[in-house]
Amino acid sequence: MKRKVLLIPLIIFLAIAAALLWQLARNAEGDDPTNLESALIGKPVPKFRLESLDNPGQFYQADVLTQGKPVLLNVWATWCPTCRAEHQYLNQLSAQGIRVVGMNYKDDRQKAISWLKELGNPYALSLFDGDGMLGLDLGVYGAPETFLIDGNGIIRYRHAGDLNPRVWEEEIKPLWEKYSKEAAQ
């Protein structure tokens, strides 16, 4: 009886180790857990009413993301180290004329305002999602995440993780150009 009881922890350990090795093998084969497909691709941005980050009392709705041209919706927070890493690249994209709307996610408003003053503000508009409800509606599970939204307010792409030159050039820019051309017609 004691021998059987002693085997139970060993069996549990082996099962956990096997699951871990299986997931590592999937990741090595290119199964990237950050590339989770969004159920919202091809669907309109969820309706929302959010306050401006830097102008409390000023509210915005989903129509700020449907202005006839594509927009990047960047979900960020001061508690997110990867957001800091991607921030300078967002400043560069903004300087190139790429419209970026920021959504500060589950954060302290004053810290976020100070952070933008310190690092520069790439956002044409900064929304404050302090309770995370729009993030929940978008399926956000962490920051940063970036959504490409076409001029009609349809979500066309979602990227979880930092937006960097490789991600922009290989994944988002071709779609940005496609939807920019469609908007110009």
From Swiss-Prot:
- Which InterPro entries would you find in this protein's record? Periplasmic_diS_OxRdtase_DsbE (IPR004799), Redoxin (IPR013740), Thioredoxin-like_sf (IPR036249), Thioredoxin_CS (IPR017937), Thioredoxin_domain (IPR013766), Thioredoxin_ResA/DsbE_sf (IPR050553)
Described by its record, this protein's role is as follows:
Involved in disulfide bond formation. Catalyzes a late, reductive step in the assembly of periplasmic c-type cytochromes, probably the reduction of disulfide bonds of the apocytochrome c to allow covalent linkage with the heme. Possible subunit of a heme lyase. DsbE is maintained in a reduced state by DsbD.
Record's subcellular location: Cell inner membrane
Q: What is this protein called?
A: Thiol:disulfide interchange protein DsbE
* Sequence ranges on the Periplasmic membrane side: 26-185
The stretches that face the Cytoplasmic side, renumbered to this chain, are: 1-4
| GO CC list | outer membrane-bounded periplasmic space; plasma membrane
Identify the domain of life: Bacteria
Which topology term describes how it sits in the membrane?
A: Single-pass membrane protein
User: What NCBIfam families would the database entry show?
Assistant: dsbE, PRK15412.1
The record lists the organism as Escherichia coli (strain K12)
Q: Where is the Thioredoxin domain?
A: 39-177
Q: Which cysteines are joined by disulfide bonds?
A: 80-83
User: Mind telling me which SUPFAM superfamilies this protein's record contains?
Assistant: Thioredoxin-like
| Biological process according to GO | cytochrome complex assembly
Family annotation (Pfam families): Redoxin
Q: Where exactly are the transmembrane stretches of this chain?
A: 5-25
Q: Tell me which PROSITE patterns the record gives.
A: THIOREDOXIN_1, THIOREDOXIN_2
